[in-house]
């Protein structure tokens, strides 16, 4: 079952009478399965934050539909079931952390005892117990980030949306947040997050979406993703016609124009069928090399192929 199902969603911002409209999301379709960790990555301006606002119901799509747990988003009680950490959380800095969490508990209709117990557990996990009586204005960027995560999780939501959760964190803070996300996953919660730290996405996610220019250009289940990283063979070939390009892509290779020919990127497991096709088609190979491809490499390659 999908917690979120987006079908052909588009959103355009119209900044003013004399300014050009900006299409932030363009024909976006994605499926966030229940109990999974979904990582959405893309360059600045790709449409990730707009996608999150659409998921939260903070803005309405111009076209398309968004379902939450099988219901249209506008008909669901999404706010009570989601915990949200924005990229730059604004917290009432005159409050202490304990006061902030008490306020969150009241707005979430939690009892005083549940608020206290839940707050103590979260602060302990994120190493904030000793500073809970300090005003938030005295917190560092990393401490505020961890405080924002406590705020987002206090009401024990079934779905957690995190926009750049590792932002401003030192290595120890990143480890604490990483472990907490793993724990939430083990509890069966659905987690959707955007991050520029691709190593964390690579290690955490069951599903990964690559976004550029408002479009979802690639989407992987973890098993498929693992088949696309690791050792990759790069073949520089002569010019390929459209039919040859389609055949190579169907065999698991990706293609881009380079120099006087094309550059093929082929995951190690797909090398032999692609190479056999090249031989059968008498396609000239001009050069060959192999590299270890990470998610970062795959991301950069996909953005280039999508036309950025």
Model-identified regions with their sequence ranges:
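Conserved ABC ATPase "signature" region
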Residues: 102, 106, 113-131
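Conserved ABC transporter NBD signature motif
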Residues: 64-80
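Short, charged/small-residue-rich alpha-helical element at the C-terminal edge
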Residues: 231-305
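ABC transporter nucleotide-binding domain
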Residues: 178-265
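Walker A (P-loop) phosphate-binding loop of ABC-type ATPase nucleotide-binding domains
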Residues: 43-47
